[in-house]
């Protein structure tokens, strides 16, 4: 796609009067201002989509940037003959780019080793073959390429967890799901590493029992 500037470009106010599809036509003939307009217009939309996903150990801005790449691709690839609006097409491309990037990162083992090992550890140590990731995601099986936790799914049980977990357990869980290592959590909460591990084990047991009571299929 040619992104060089053309003479006679519209200003922002004029772009606002056009449909997105019309602005894209200008992008496709080299109007970089039109491209900037669409990127700016959809930036918050990308951030909203990025908030739905997070990867253990990843910086949220990394996911936002992947979403922006997906947005650019949607602008580049959108065709007038598509049987959908640009916004719907953009949402598809943004989501696909984010998920692909997360899967690629896990395949390349970009997540911290300690986070991966801990998340993959059975909830009741050797007494159970279900992991914390299995419980939170509601997945029957979960391989490293699928270590994507949907924030919306976690929010559904967050309120109940607030009732079941102690203050320490809640803090440990939040930091753990944010990708912190045991040592980092220990330093931040000024607790021994063993105390952090014990708290997380209690969280796992409470979480599993709660979901079983609710008869959620894992």
From Swiss-Prot:
<dbReference type="InterPro" id="IPR016371">
    <property type="entry name" value="RNA_pol_sigma-H_factor"/>
</dbReference>
<keyword id="KW-0804">Transcription</keyword>
<dbReference type="InterPro" id="IPR013249">
    <property type="entry name" value="RNA_pol_sigma70_r4_t2"/>
</dbReference>
<keyword id="KW-0805">Transcription regulation</keyword>
<dbReference type="InterPro" id="IPR013324">
    <property type="entry name" value="RNA_pol_sigma_r3/r4-like"/>
</dbReference>
<protein>
    <recommendedName>
        <fullName>RNA polymerase sigma-H factor</fullName>
    </recommendedName>
</protein>
<feature type="short sequence motif" description="Polymerase core binding">
    <location>
        <begin position="62"/>
        <end position="75"/>
    </location>
</feature>
<keyword id="KW-0731">Sigma factor</keyword>
<dbReference type="InterPro" id="IPR000792">
    <property type="entry name" value="Tscrpt_reg_LuxR_C"/>
</dbReference>
<feature type="DNA-binding region" description="H-T-H motif">
    <location>
        <begin position="182"/>
        <end position="201"/>
    </location>
</feature>
<keyword id="KW-0749">Sporulation</keyword>
<dbReference type="InterPro" id="IPR014284">
    <property type="entry name" value="RNA_pol_sigma-70_dom"/>
</dbReference>
<comment type="similarity">
    <text>Belongs to the sigma-70 factor family.</text>
</comment>
<dbReference type="GO" id="GO:0030435">
    <property type="term" value="P:sporulation resulting in formation of a cellular spore"/>
</dbReference>
<dbReference type="GO" id="GO:0003677">
    <property type="term" value="F:DNA binding"/>
</dbReference>
<dbReference type="GO" id="GO:0006352">
    <property type="term" value="P:DNA-templated transcription initiation"/>
</dbReference>
<dbReference type="InterPro" id="IPR036388">
    <property type="entry name" value="WH-like_DNA-bd_sf"/>
</dbReference>
<dbReference type="InterPro" id="IPR014218">
    <property type="entry name" value="RNA_pol_sigma-H"/>
</dbReference>
<dbReference type="GO" id="GO:0016987">
    <property type="term" value="F:sigma factor activity"/>
</dbReference>
<keyword id="KW-0238">DNA-binding</keyword>
<comment type="function">
    <text>Sigma factors are initiation factors that promote the attachment of RNA polymerase (RNAP) to specific initiation sites and are then released. This sigma factor is involved in the transition to post-exponential phase in the beginning of sporulation. It is also required for transcription of several stationary phase genes. Association with the RNAP core increases rapidly in early exponential phase, and reamins constant expression level after.</text>
</comment>
<dbReference type="GO" id="GO:0006355">
    <property type="term" value="P:regulation of DNA-templated transcription"/>
</dbReference>
<dbReference type="InterPro" id="IPR000943">
    <property type="entry name" value="RNA_pol_sigma70"/>
</dbReference>
<comment type="subunit">
    <text>Interacts transiently with the RNAP core.</text>
</comment>
<dbReference type="InterPro" id="IPR007627">
    <property type="entry name" value="RNA_pol_sigma70_r2"/>
</dbReference>
<dbReference type="Pfam" id="PF04542">
    <property type="entry name" value="Sigma70_r2"/>
</dbReference>
<dbReference type="Pfam" id="PF08281">
    <property type="entry name" value="Sigma70_r4_2"/>
</dbReference>
<dbReference type="InterPro" id="IPR013325">
    <property type="entry name" value="RNA_pol_sigma_r2"/>
</dbReference>
């Amino acid at each position: 796609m040619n992104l060089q500037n053309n003479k006679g470009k519209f200003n922002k106010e004029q772009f606002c009067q056009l449909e997105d599809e019309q602005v894209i036509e200008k992008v496709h003939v080299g109007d970089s201002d039109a491209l900037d307009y669409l990127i700016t217009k959809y930036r918050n939309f990308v951030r909203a989509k990025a908030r739905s996903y997070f990867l253990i150990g990843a910086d949220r801005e990394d996911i936002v940037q992947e979403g922006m790449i997906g947005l650019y691709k949607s602008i580049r690839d959108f065709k007038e003959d598509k049987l959908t609006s640009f916004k719907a097409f953009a949402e598809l491309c943004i989501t696909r780019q984010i998920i692909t990037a997360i899967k690629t990162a896990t395949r390349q083992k970009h997540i911290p080793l300690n986070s991966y090992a801990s998340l993959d550890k059975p909830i009741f140590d050797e007494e159970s073959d279900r992991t914390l990731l299995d419980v939170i995601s509601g997945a029957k099986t979960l391989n490293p390429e699928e270590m994507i936790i949907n924030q919306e799914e976690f929010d559904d049980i967050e309120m109940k967890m607030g009732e079941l977990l102690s203050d320490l357990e809640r803090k440990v869980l939040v930091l753990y799901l944010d990708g912190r290592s045991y040592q980092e959590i220990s330093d931040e909460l000024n607790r021994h590493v063993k105390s952090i591990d014990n708290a997380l084990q209690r969280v796992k047991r409470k979480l599993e029992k709660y979901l079983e009571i609710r008869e959620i299929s894992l």
